[in-house]
């Protein structure tokens, strides 16, 4: 459709500089929470030939599912006390369990509300029926080794990290992708909540 009606679909001005909208709209309804992960910022995504990925969630009326809460960010004290590597690196090296979530904050998935999530923010979406608008990229780094007994392959931790970075810093390379200040924002809810 874009090849035939590019100006009509994208608008003349936008079509001059863009080949596509670069956005996807998804509706998801998972039986379990999605793993704790992040989408790399522009400067990191481009290193692996990809685009960064921003997301926005809107929670629909029903069903909420068994875990209608989403984990976002990290506790502010972790960054304030500069304990990111001390706390997170052992989880990434050991790669088991889901206890890494205890260092994040869970927010209820309230129908009619949602969240905006720039690239670089850690998150583990809940099970509420969700309308998600996202940039069209699959770039990510997964930091959670297991969800409710289901093992997650460690390759998802470093799949979108350069081979050089992984060889040099291994699991610590993932921690360099995280926007720690944004993840520890004491006003995270106020700055990202959509109503």
Where are these regions (language model features)?
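Active-site region of the double-stranded beta-helix
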Residues: 1-111, 124-195
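Pseudouridine synthase
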Residues: 120
